[in-house]
């Protein structure tokens, strides 16, 4: 909770942008509070970090927040945008019947753990052949988002492990929650 313009406590989300440099050093680039997110919000956040010295972003891993990928491409056009695989999996499994989840996940794992993008596409075709009739919305989501879900295949295994998920920022959020969970309101 934060205090609003009328000094009342309101619930707001805090959006964090964390960068990792070539040496693996992590840095909090910005914390932003907003009532809602969207392209204009993300444009202002990215313009802010650019004005404070960020010259380029090689790879951005996002959880597919509304307007974020477009804003990244607008401010930093050379950036490779990778949608978090873990978020995509969580969103997918919600639509799969519980009795099929274990088998479906085993088949899906063949897609995102493939050795190459080409192999992943073959595995995605296999997934669709096996599960497409039962779960067309899941397959459609993977197909529609494939460019951003498969961007990490162009990098080595070491880089892939860092960028296929938003675990870096999620870990930071866990640390913040530990410190702030007993705090009532931020002013």
Please give the residue ranges for each predicted region:
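A generic hydrophobic-helix recognition signal that picks specific residues
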Residues: 56, 80, 160-163
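Acidic/histidine-rich catalytic cores and adjacent linkers
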Residues: 113-187
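RNase H-like nuclease fold core
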Residues: 1-62, 66, 70, 75-78, ...
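Short, well-ordered secondary-structure micro-motifs
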Residues: 6, 72, 96, 152-153
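Conserved beta-strand -> loop -> alpha-helix junction used to position metal-binding or nucleic-acid-contacting
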Residues: 59-66, 71-109
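Amphipathic alpha-helical transducer elements in NTP-driven molecular machines
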Residues: 11-14, 39-43, 62-69, 86, ...
């Amino acid at each position: 909770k934060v205090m609003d313009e009328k000094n009342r406590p309101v619930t707001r989300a805090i959006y964090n942008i964390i960068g990792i440099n070539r040496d693996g050093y992590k840095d909090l680039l910005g914390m932003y509070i907003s009532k809602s997110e969207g392209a204009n919000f993300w444009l202002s956040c990215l313009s802010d970090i650019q004005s404070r010295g960020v010259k380029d972003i090689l790879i951005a891993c996002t959880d597919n927040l509304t307007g974020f990928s477009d804003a990244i491409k607008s401010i930093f056009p050379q950036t490779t945008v990778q949608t978090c695989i873990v978020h995509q999996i969580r969103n997918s499994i919600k639509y799969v019947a519980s009795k099929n989840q274990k088998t479906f996940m085993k088949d899906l794992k063949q897609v995102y753990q493939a050795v190459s993008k080409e192999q992943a596409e073959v595995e995605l075709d296999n997934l669709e052949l096996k599960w497409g009739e039962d779960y067309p919305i899941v397959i459609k989501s993977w197909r529609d988002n494939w460019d951003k879900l498969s961007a990490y295949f162009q990098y080595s295994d070491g880089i892939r492990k860092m960028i296929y998920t938003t675990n870096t920022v999620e870990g930071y959020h866990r640390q913040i929650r530990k410190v702030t969970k007993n705090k009532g309101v931020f002013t």
